[in-house]
Amino acid sequence: MEIPQLDRSNYLKGLLITARKDNQLNETEISIIKKFAARLGFSSDFFEETISHLLENKYITEEPIKFSKPDIAKSFIEDGLKLAISDDKIGDDETNWLIETAQMNGIDKVWVTKKMKEIQNKPHLIGKMDFALFSLI
């Protein structure tokens, strides 16, 4: 599937927002986001600059993101949940923001909750599981 550049940018932005919602970044989160940045076509210099200033960057707004297609939105929500739980806990801020983004894209909260439970039941697989985006591109 061809993913428009705006959706690519929003996908990465959304992952960055999700990662900073708990006011910390760990190595697992950084590694996951780096993989996404590369697959989405962003340079490693851009990634390094963005990630190094992520927590204090006030220019990254945190409004829920609207994607152009439901498949891209569902992929993002699933990957956002995997990223959020990669530090072994998922906070209310992370969950609420992902639910708001899902609802902005016409995705039911029940679907998000079900997907979150599926992922939480397999936390040991987070680093080994395929991310939803990778099946789209």
Model regions and ranges:
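Small-residue-enriched hydrophobic alpha-helices in membranes
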Residues: 1-137
